[in-house]
Amino acid sequence: MKMLQGVRAFQKLKKSCAYSTAAKELKPLPVKETVNMAYDLHLPERSVIGKMPYHSPEPIVFIHGLFGWKRFYRNDCKTLATALQTPVYAVDMRNHGDTEHAMPFDYNTLMDDLVLLLRKLDIKKVNLIGYSMGGKMSMLTALNYPELVSSACIIDNAPINQPHISPFLKVFSKSCQHVENMKIRATDKEWRSKVAVGLKRYIPNPGIRSYLLQNVSGTPPKKYRSPVIDWNDGNVHFVNPVNHLFQCVVKDASAWPVEQVAGKQFLGPVNFIRGTKSEFVNADGEKAIAEYFPYHKIQSINTTHNVLHERPQEYLRSVIDFFKTTRYVLERKRDSERVTMIAKPKPLTSSQNAAEYS
């Protein structure tokens, strides 16, 4: 069984990653169909109902974007948990943060990792917040596992193939590789400044440089040590396996499995937040959103793709208002269904009637 799973995973890897000569020289990452996603659980700081149960109905799962990390959004998740009186799980996707480094790195694999986590946590129904890559991961999960998803908030992404964002992804990856090749010493007191200068060669936006800089460290993460990053060489490194990801990200992060989800719809409420200066949600994206998610709304915020960092208060207000409204509507719908069931009970079969009165 394990051998069969390994073969399937390797077949997915060959399809998803464009190998180059340089890639073959890299120490390979393990190939795994699923990995255990690291997560942090944020509970409301003040609760109107006393201590919040860990398995509250329909918690929120917050999924970061490319080169993100759950710890970046610790304060955001605490704000959401308290404002919505709901547990919030912030997760790290594979090859990010505290989660294992492994291939493949495509949306179907990321979705499988998320579904595995939900089942391990015994979460029957969830509300998703997904940013960038996390947004596509959330949309795919909602379409393929609608029974697991109550609602979703998608931040600056759309369910389409996006070849037009490939240059953006290439710059991201090249900047990270450039910093790795600089071999900046961890003992250098100015290493953060030198990393910032290295990133500036490809990335003029200071907000994006600051975002990437948070992934660079002079010491290995405490919770996970990558098998392909040499933390003993005395240099600073990205905590992500950037040289491996470069082979996949440009192709797979902009992709969308059109054939797999053809004809599928998610009938729950979905809130899309897009940056007005971003190219991720264009006219084709709006059309696809309407096809896959008929009960949606789109809100624009005056930002680039870096929505969460440029306008944190605006996006949080949008998310909180959406989930509060959605909760109210869904609760009224459920109450109405309960009343209907009581008023019009399902007829018993003759055998059930006999058993009832025997």
From Swiss-Prot:
Q: Where in the cell is it found?
A: Mitochondrion
Domain of life where this protein originates:
Eukaryota
Q: What does this protein do?
A: Alcohol acetyltransferase that catalyzes the synthesis of ethyl acetate from ethanol and acetyl-CoA. Can also function as a thioesterase by hydrolyzing acetyl-CoA in the absence of ethanol, as well as esterase hydrolyzing ethyl acetate.
Among SUPFAM superfamilies, the record links this protein to:
alpha/beta-Hydrolases
Active site residues of this protein: 132, 156, 305
Q: Which PANTHER family match?
A: PROTEIN ABHD11
Q: Family membership, please give it.
A: Belongs to the AB hydrolase superfamily.
Q: Say which species the protein is native to.
A: Eremothecium cymbalariae (strain CBS 270.75 / DBVPG 7215 / KCTC 17166 / NRRL Y-17582) (Yeast)
Q: What is the protein's major site of localization? A: mitochondrion
**What is any Pfam family matched here?**
Abhydrolase_1
Q: Which reaction is the catalytic activity of this chain?
A: ethanol + acetyl-CoA = ethyl acetate + CoA; acetyl-CoA + H2O = acetate + CoA + H(+); ethyl acetate + H2O = ethanol + acetate + H(+)
Could you give one GO CC term from the UniProt record? mitochondrion
Q: Which UniProt keywords apply?
A: Hydrolase, Mitochondrion, Transferase
Query: According to the UniProt entry, what is the EC number of this protein?
Result: 2.3.1.268, 3.1.2.1, 3.1.1.-
Record InterPro entries? AB_hydrolase_1, AB_hydrolase_fold
One Gene Ontology molecular-function label? transferase activity
What protein name applies here?
Ethanol acetyltransferase 1
Presence of the UniProt keyword Ribonucleoprotein in the record: no
In this chain the AB hydrolase-1 domain maps to 59-166
